[in-house]
C-alpha cells in the first residue's frame, strides 16, 4: 500500500474509533488536563480555543463580549511560571484579533533548550513566521530530543499532551516549514516522513495509544494536515505537467 493510501486508511479508521456519539471529531481544543486533575487553566484555554474556532468559522457574533473580555484577562495572567500553558494558549490563536508574539516565543524557546514541550510548541509557532534557517536548526535539535525521550521510554502518560501529542505539534511545524522557501526542503521532507511513520506505529486495536483524548485529537489533526499538504502538492505538480 502506498503512503497516501496508508494515511487515508489510518485517518478514516481513527475518525471512526475516536468519534463521539454524533459521528464527528469534536473541535473542542481540550478534553483533559495537564496533570490528570481538573484545572482552571486548561478549561480556560479550551474555552478560548472554542471561541477562536467560532470566530474563524464566522460565528463570532454569537460570543458574549463580556465573557470574552474576562477570559482574555485571565489568560493574560499566564506567564513565565506557566510556560507550557502559555505556549498551549498561543497554539489556539487562529484569528488576526489575537496575534502571536513571536519575539517572546523565540525568547522562551532559547531559554529552555531541554524542555521538549516548550521546544515542540515554540517550534510549531515559529515555523509559520520565524526565519526559515533558524527554524530548521530548531527542527534538527528537536528531533534529537524526541529520539532521546523515546529511547528512554518517556511518554508522559496521564498528561493532557503526552509525547505523541508533542510529536504531532512537531509534525505540524515541519509541514508549515516545508511550505516555505528553504534550502533544506529535502531534509525537512525526511523529518516529516519520520514523524508520520512514528505516529502511525502508535496505533492500537482501540485507536491511538494514548491516555489523553487531546493527544489523540492532535495526532489526527496533524495527520489530516499532512494529507491536505500532500494533495495540494500533487495538485500543483499536476498543473505544472499540464502546462508543459
Predicted features, each with a name:
Residues 1-244:
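Preference for long, amphipathic alpha-helical scaffolds in soluble/luminal domains
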Amino acid at each position: 500500500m502506498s503512503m497516501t493510501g496508508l494515511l487515508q486508511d489510518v485517518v478514516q479508521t481513527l475518525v471512526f474509533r475516536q468519534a463521539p456519539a454524533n459521528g464527528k471529531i469534536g473541535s473542542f481544543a481540550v478534553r483533559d488536563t495537564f496533570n490528570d486533575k481538573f484545572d482552571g487553566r486548561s478549561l480556560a484555554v479550551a474555552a478560548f480555543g472554542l471561541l477562536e474556532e467560532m470566530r474563524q468559522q464566522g460565528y463570532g457574533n454569537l460570543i458574549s463580549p463580556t465573557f470574552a473580555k474576562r477570559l482574555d484577562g485571565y489568560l493574560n495572567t499566564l506567564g513565565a511560571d506557566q510556560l507550557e500553558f502559555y505556549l498551549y494558549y498561543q497554539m489556539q490563536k487562529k484569528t488576526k484579533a489575537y496575534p502571536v508574539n513571536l519575539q517572546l516565543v523565540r525568547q522562551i524557546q532559547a531559554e529552555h533548550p531541554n524542555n521538549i514541550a516548550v521546544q515542540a510548541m515554540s517550534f510549531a509557532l515559529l515555523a509559520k513566521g520565524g526565519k526559515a534557517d533558524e527554524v530548521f536548526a530548531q527542527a534538527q535539535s528537536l528531533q534529537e530530543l524526541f529520539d532521546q525521550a523515546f529511547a528512554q521510554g518517556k511518554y508522559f502518560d496521564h498528561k493532557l499532551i503526552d509525547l505523541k501529542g508533542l510529536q504531532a505539534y512537531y509534525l505540524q511545524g515541519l509541514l508549515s516549514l516545508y511550505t516555505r522557501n528553504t534550502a533544506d526542503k529535502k531534509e525537512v521532507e525526511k523529518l516529516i516522513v519520520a514523524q508520520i511513520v512514528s505516529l502511525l506505529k502508535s496505533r492500537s486495536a482501540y485507536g491511538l495509544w494514548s491516555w489523553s483524548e487531546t493527544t489523540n485529537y492532535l495526532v489526527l489533526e496533524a495527520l489530516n494536515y499532512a494529507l491536505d499538504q500532500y494533495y495540494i502538492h500533487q495538485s500543483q505538480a499536476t498543473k505544472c505537467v499540464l502546462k508543459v
